[in-house]
């Protein structure tokens, strides 16, 4: 019989070990954020790391109802699907690189910048010349106008989550290299395009500074967003069931006629 092995946990009759430590030695002793570090990095976070990761997760807990990932969740909830189905709709709608995938892309951008060994200004110029997106910057709601310093500082002040996290980073005297580069890119990009830092850009710098790897970036976004999805699911239960069908019943006569004509021609009808 095939056997699965792991070097980080053991479960037996009456015992559970996580990285060699009995689970009862962790329950009541570690916070959830500390357990994340313990599981993913086999270490306890420094006080400033724990405070910052906690703050980041809190910042994700409210996105309103305009975010694409909330749509699938809310539609599922409206037909009285269980919360698990709504949560899966939320996660499925979030998987694309232009939504939750943006955090991982932003983290990989920062890694590439470090590998290239060029300045933030050179990185921005290269990406713009190539017509490539710089992940972690720009937002459909939180905008600013282009301009040279000191107006470039505005690009850190548009998104309230960015504003709060960077203020906390300054208060904690954050010395991480990746967050520093995020802010440098932000200033350079703002001067050229008036594009501000967004929450993914700040998070990319912070998470890399804290030692987390890009391939698990989705973990943090899902952890932070699920409470919001649960609240939306509960709210939808008080609405009229299946109320979103109205969005799907508007006929497009032009489209229908085109399709009908193509079908008619393919069947040898009038030309």
Protein language model regions, located:
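Non-transmembrane, aqueous-exposed alpha-helical and coiled segments at domain scale
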Residues: 1-271
